[in-house]
């Protein structure tokens, strides 16, 4: 019997790519960012704002990327997008669950491979704000969409939810008081070589 210790994380990265002086840079190319995310056997990046043209730029050595993206409109900027990374050593026990749309990526951990009581589904989700142009245009109720996808999983699986659920807390704290927030460094320092 194999015993696995999984480290699973998820972050809203508010755009995986940055355009600096006409050059496109990926946060995945930043050594600090990559060092942090690569400590986890499974990690999800939410609101990557990528399109199908960017999929090859999302690949990370040693990981399989499962992604969902929205179509780029003729005018306007990119929105949404999810990229889920699974370390190659775990791939025999992980499968992507086919879903429609670009708001959710679900993967299933096989109970036999991971020595679990039941199969476990990890749902990485981005819920667009209700007043966003995307929701206004598509009339998508992201919570209803998520509920529909979860109802298809059945009763014999455990489910883990990760993502950005656009929770509004009003005047209450939307974080745990006293929590150590040094887990994910803010990464905005891009070293650009050859530019002055």
Label every PLM stretch briefly:
Residues 1-196:
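A shared catalytic/ligand-binding motif for oxyanion handling
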